Amino acid sequence: VNYQKYNATNNTRTKCDLYFKVKPPMVSEYITTLAQTDTANLAVDDYGNTRYIGKNPNNFVSFDGDIWRIIGVMKNVDDGTGNKEDRVKIIRSESIGYYSWDTSESSVNNGRGVNEWSQADLMKLLNPGYESESVGGSLYWNNKSGTCYSDYKNQTTSCNFTSTGIKDKLKNMLGNAVWNTGASTTYSQIASKFYTEERGTRNGKICTSGTYCTDAVARTTTWTGKIGLMYPSDYGYATSGG
């Protein structure tokens, strides 16, 4: 085997300029840092989460032309597998319409549905994986039109999310998260109390008899998925700035 000898005289030298692009900070890092100076629009809650507050803070963000608002940076969000990281929580700026949280036949809770988010009709409308549902199934997630539940006793209406559904850019950013669905003991209390009870062990099955209490659905206090609703504590903390 012949090996070519390295000849040092074959080397050439030249001048060049190297440019390094500074990597921008993560949104969560940017907001957390901004909160140290912008105390009019941002505040850290009792549990270390950084939140936008006040009547109309500049917390808008756009994805593919859709406008959302940043609720804040939530600490140590579990992705459902035990991995935890800080996450930015956003809410759509405009309503997508009026649809049932859940509904049912009149024989079940007098047609009012069941207050269990993990099985709710609205959850199945918003999230992926429910395409087999004949009404509402993943229409919002898939940017499709069809029929959605709109009132009690399984009433339906036509719905169209071809322009308002989740766009691909945002889909690629949405990860699973553990949502806390613990029930509150009252409708009126401070935000920190709501926050604690959302993460508590009390579920939404608070009745034992009557026409509005006939379902046999097991209640849970957590749910893992991509799209949920604003917590009562989110609203309470957001309005704390006026």
Regions found by a protein language model. Name each.
Residues 1-242:
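Long, domain-scale functional regions
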